[in-house]
């Protein structure tokens, strides 16, 4: 009879999370034992309390705190929601479970029935919608300093990866170079992945899954010794963390390929400096030295001595007219501190002048080999990227 596999990485992750929970929530118990009003102090997760650290190139939470007390009528429900969710997560860690955020919503969802001193009956739901329980999970993240992935909470897999690399996950050694026409789905707990060995010079992250599949099928990653990843649109947390680890632990440069429009550029910035709405995650999820490889406006139209990759006829054929929402988004990006470098201001100004955008697929319309064997390698070799 085969011995039962013991996942040491999983065990250590649970031990760490349980220890943090005990330490942080012990403070509340001690307040109760002293006869004090039990209170949780949380960093405020608001736009006004989000700052850009120019030195570290990261979006971070600022110094403002939120006081959540049991005896505050305006905060008591949120206080109890926080303790309820913390208990559910703690029990799941103890039981070696892997709950999803949807599981946590249902595990805590119930109705509390109570009566006023005069006898009037009341009902109060712990929470009504998942967005409420999700917000509580985020509060627990900032309170404990643990990402939900470190609490072994699962979410839907989104990102995919292929390349000349072997990893260990759940006791299995997985060769990412032997995925056939498919790819390895980046698991929602990327810190449980062990990197065994890698033979690659850089990481290429492609916004679009369809372009990722095309590059994969023609063997781009083999020929150019790359780890090829897709975020399939806006990146999920697991993909961002996986990319960060490849850069931080293995020293691989990271290049991001998106559509030439403000939404693609923002996807790049989420990988690089973090998300505005989830800035508390940036220190572990963002990759500050990620490089934007394209598609850039100067690739389309040229700039000074730089020649465009598209002819005038190709521009007429492939360019898409920008919508009002695109233009509005471009002005927003232009005002963000992290887009106020000279190169980014040039890109955004060209976009606003031309009111034109381009999808990555326009480059493949010149031939897939053009994208794979000329455009991408040439831009990497010549350092034609934006940081």
Swiss-Prot record:
CDD domains to which the protein is assigned, alphabetical: TOPRIM_TopoIIB_SPO
Domain of life: Archaea
Enzyme Commission numbers on file: 5.6.2.2
PROSITE patterns per the UniProt record, alphabetical: TOPO_IIB
InterPro entries assigned to the protein according to its UniProt record, in alphabetical order: Spo11/TopoVI_A (IPR002815), Spo11/TopoVI_A_N (IPR013049), Spo11/TopoVI_A_sf (IPR036078), Topo_VI_alpha (IPR049333), TopoVI_A (IPR004085), TOPRIM_Topo6A/Spo11 (IPR034136), WH-like_DNA-bd_sf (IPR036388)
Cofactor dependence: Mg(2+)
Membrane spanning residue stretches: none
Binding, Mg(2+): 207, 259
Reactions it catalyzes: ATP-dependent breakage, passage and rejoining of double-stranded DNA
GO CC terms: chromosome
Residue positions of the active site: 106
Recorded family membership: Belongs to the TOP6A family.
Subunit relationships: Homodimer. Heterotetramer of two Top6A and two Top6B chains.
Role played: Relaxes both positive and negative superturns and exhibits a strong decatenase activity.
Protein name (record): Type 2 DNA topoisomerase 6 subunit A
Organism of derivation: Hyperthermus butylicus (strain DSM 5456 / JCM 9403 / PLM1-5)
């Amino acid at each position: 009879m085969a011995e039962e596999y013991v996942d040491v990485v999983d065990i250590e992750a649970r031990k760490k999370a349980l220890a943090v929970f005990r330490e942080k929530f012990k403070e509340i118990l001690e307040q109760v034992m002293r006869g004090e009003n039990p209170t949780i102090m949380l960093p405020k997760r608001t736009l006004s309390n989000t700052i850009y650290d120019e030195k570290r190139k990261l979006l971070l939470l600022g110094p403002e705190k939120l006081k959540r007390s049991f005896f505050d009528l305006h905060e008591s429900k949120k206080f109890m929601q926080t303790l309820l969710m913390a208990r559910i997560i703690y029990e799941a860690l103890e039981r070696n479970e892997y709950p999803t955020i949807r599981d946590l919503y249902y595990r805590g969802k119930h109705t509390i029935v109570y009566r006023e001193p005069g006898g009037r009956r009341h009902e109060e739901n712990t929470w009504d919608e998942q967005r409420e329980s999700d917000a509580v999970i985020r509060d627990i993240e900032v309170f404990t300093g643990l990402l939900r992935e470190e609490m072994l909470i699962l979410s839907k897999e989104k990102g995919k990866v292929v390349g000349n690399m072997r990893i260990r996950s759940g006791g299995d050694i997985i060769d990412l170079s032997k995925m056939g026409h498919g790819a390895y789905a980046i698991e929602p707990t990327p810190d449980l992945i062990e990197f065994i060995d890698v033979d690659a010079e850089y990481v290429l992250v492609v916004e679009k899954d369809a372009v990722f599949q095309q590059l994969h099928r023609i063997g781009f990653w083999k020929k150019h010794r790359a780890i090829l990843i897709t975020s399939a649109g806006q990146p999920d947390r697991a993909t961002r963390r996986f990319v960060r680890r490849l850069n931080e632990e293995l020293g691989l440069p990271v290049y991001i390929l998106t559509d030439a429009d403000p939404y693609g550029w923002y996807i790049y910035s989420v990988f690089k400096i973090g998300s505005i709405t989830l800035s508390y995650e940036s220190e572990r999820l963002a990759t500050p030295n990620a490089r934007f490889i394209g598609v850039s406006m100067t690739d389309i139209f040229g700039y000074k001595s730089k020649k465009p990759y598209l002819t005038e006829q190709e521009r007429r054929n492939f360019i898409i007219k920008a919508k009002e929402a695109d233009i509005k988004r471009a002005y927003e990006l232009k005002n963000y501190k992290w887009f106020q470098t000279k190169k980014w201001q040039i890109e955004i100004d060209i976009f606003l002048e031309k009111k034109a955008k381009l999808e990555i697929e326009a480059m493949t319309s010149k031939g897939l080999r053009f994208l794979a064997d000329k455009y991408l390698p040439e831009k990497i070799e010549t350092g034609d990227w934006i940081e």
